[in-house]
Amino acid sequence: FEKQIEIAKNNYDVIGSNILEVDQNNEIQNLEKQMPTSNRDIKKYLKSRNPINHMTAFYKTDLVKKVGGYPDFYHREDYGLWIKLNYHGAIFYNINESLVQVNGGKSLFKRRRGFKNIPAEFKLQLLCYRLKIKPFYLAILHFFARVIILLLPINILSKFYIYKLRKKK
């Protein structure tokens, strides 16, 4: 966390970074999840996608306590927290570098899909609407778009992630 500690001196409340995905054999897949870096770009990105890779997150715990901590949103607790922190004026920053390697592949896609994720997605979109992150119609549109993605077969979902949500390194 050396880089995050140094950057935190600039009064950022939440600091993250890009991640590099590896497969089950710890082999690099050459897939990087790149994130927006500036506070302005992160807040814009927040309206449609999770702007902080949770495993890289470095944040002020007093601010997290002030907003009531993580919401109870199955597999979306971190995204819900960033939404709450944004509403309370948190300042975000992402380091434009992959500081962590994460397990991608089928295990990632199995966790990210299925009916069990739908109620949490609804709660997340409702939170976005209630905290004025997005208008109601957009929250509903995003909810239904994500439900479709959540119900995709793993082989199609993996291609969607690889070709639409990741960058080749």
Provide a role label for each language-model segment:
Residues 1-30:
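Conserved donor NDP-sugar-binding/catalytic core segment of glycosyltransferases
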Residues 6-7, 44, 127:
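Surface-exposed charged/polar residues within alpha-helices that form helix-capping/stabilizing sites
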Residues 8, 12, 31-32, 91-93, ...:
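A generic structural signal for ordered secondary structure
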Residues 16, 26, 68-69, 132:
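Glycine-centered small-residue hotspots that permit tight backbone geometry or close packing
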Residues 23, 31-115:
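Conserved nucleotide-sugar donor-binding catalytic segment
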Residues 74-75, 80-83, 87, 92-169:
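C-terminal subregions of glycosyltransferases and related glycan-biosynthesis enzymes
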